[in-house]
Amino acid sequence: MEYHIRQYDLHQGALEIEYIEEYFGEFPRKKTADEVIRRLTDRDHQIVMAEAPLTDDPGTVVPVAYKVSHELRQNETDLKLADLVERLTGTVEFFGRKVLYSWIGGTRRDWRGQGFFRALTEEQEAWALDNGFDEILTKTKNRLYSMRGTLDHLEFNVIKLEPNEQDNRESKVYLSKKLGLEVLDRHRSKRSVIHSN
């Protein structure tokens, strides 16, 4: 199967993210286009979506999965990102390296288990290597078992667990993947990428 991926510029991509997140009931708070723009402005970033035809109407193509990632710097001024860097200090080396943070993403329920998230992640890795990144970081919740399993299959390593004392399922799990050309050799998805402006 060939996966069709669309890579967006900042403003159009932010609108697309606001739209697709409406399909994710498991996200308690959806990202707005303004929030995405504020987070990504003035930093290297990537917004990608996988598209597929509807099974009952193959002429209609819809977004089924997405990923948004951005550069994470040692000296962040954004309070949330500065807090993230602080939490990872001693675990991740930021000095003299480019680190990509896989911020948000997901696959619509009816499309899960079909390789869309793998294809987006592999495209993210190829883009990251092309743009000089050394490592990809991501964060998930302990209760998101299928996401943790997918990240394991994609060879992300757990680098930190931040326990939640009230409910272990809400504990934060930080994962990392160091990048090198050998990462591309392990890619399995066939992808075509369209750049939208």
Predicted segments, located by residue:
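Conserved acyl-donor/pantetheine-binding loop and adjacent beta-alpha core of acyl/acetyltransferases
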Residues: 57-104, 165-166
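Short amphipathic alpha-helix that is part of the acyltransferase structural core
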Residues: 1-64
